[in-house]
Amino acid sequence: MSAKNFKPFFLNSNLSFGKAGGDTVESLLRPAAGNSGNSYITYALVKTVLGDFAGLSHIANAYEYDFSASGRDAEFARAECTHVFLVLQDQIRIEESYGLRLPYENIASFLKKCGKPVVIAGLGANSFGGFDPEFHKKLPPALVKFLREISGMCEKIGIRGEFTADVLAKLGISNFQIIGCPSFFETGPGRRVEKPPFGELNPALTSPLIYRAESAPALMQDFLEKRLIDLAVFGRIPDGCPREEFYRAARGNLQIFLNPESWKAFLKKFNFALGPRVHGSIAAINAGLPAVCTNTDSRTAEMCAFLKIPRLADGPYADYKPPIPDAREFGAFLRRAYDACDVDAMNAAYPALFENYKNFITSQNLPFRCGECANAGMLSEVKVRGRIELFARRIAFKARRSAAKRLLKRNRS
């Protein structure tokens, strides 16, 4: 299909446009369904097939969308669009994150009303107990029905790795292609990452929870870091706020992004990344940094294995708990991560992986672009509180607390 005639509709884009929403962590992350990393998938797909964010036709959050009033959107997609992209992450799981449940029946009904070819790229299975050969038997029946139904609407489903392929095959679904994640390929075919000498490392963390020192720059993504997002973005200082948390925010070492371009621009200040966030690792790699992912779940394991993303998933500080206790332990952990970071293997595998992804797109008669994308500046920016404002709020907070204590003491006497 020519790019001129191509007009996609994105369902569950997880993108946020304009001013970042609201004054709570929940409202801020609502378009992204609770995790800013989700938006990276659609961002990459738009770069791949469209090349422009202006006028994007999309529904941001399928979990909160009112499908009872979806007639107008479905009719628009049917009349004006050529394809519907259903953006999913690791929803092949026994229970979803944050107590959510994808509205399977409503999504399937909406797609049928649209009457257009459906494209899915980046779907994964997630077993927190590792690669369970009986995992497919433990999935909710409604999810299994949904997977079979949407597979019939797609020419092929782009999936994350070998474990997902095994699960789908055991469910009787065969029209899939392993691609990893679209986000991994958003910078185009020529990407190479160089590893600096260990003595020159200037690392950033893909989650602040693994090491809590105020001097350690880190990226926040979801509700696991709610208290830190509340502090850094909204300036809310909780009772008993640890000193290192406050000073970490005041130094600008806690950041969150809804625009992947800004995310990568921040990461370019550093030359190494590590931590449990797989999309945090991918953002770092696309910013030119070697990165090591320390997550242990199957979602991460299969995608890192397929894409050759360096991974360190053993030892006491994998995942999020316990946090690394001190600078000495962090130094040792950093050394282990550095030694595990095989950028040569990743660089060598990338050209063939990129061609595989390109084949997935073009074999469905979709236009294929790569590289620059117009109007990415339309995506929302998140501004963290500055040092002066946070200190002013801290002084005011202490004054209010002191006044409340004096009043309580006076009332008791």
Regions found by a protein language model. Give the residues of each.
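Active-site anion-handling motifs in enzyme catalytic cores
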Residues: 1-413
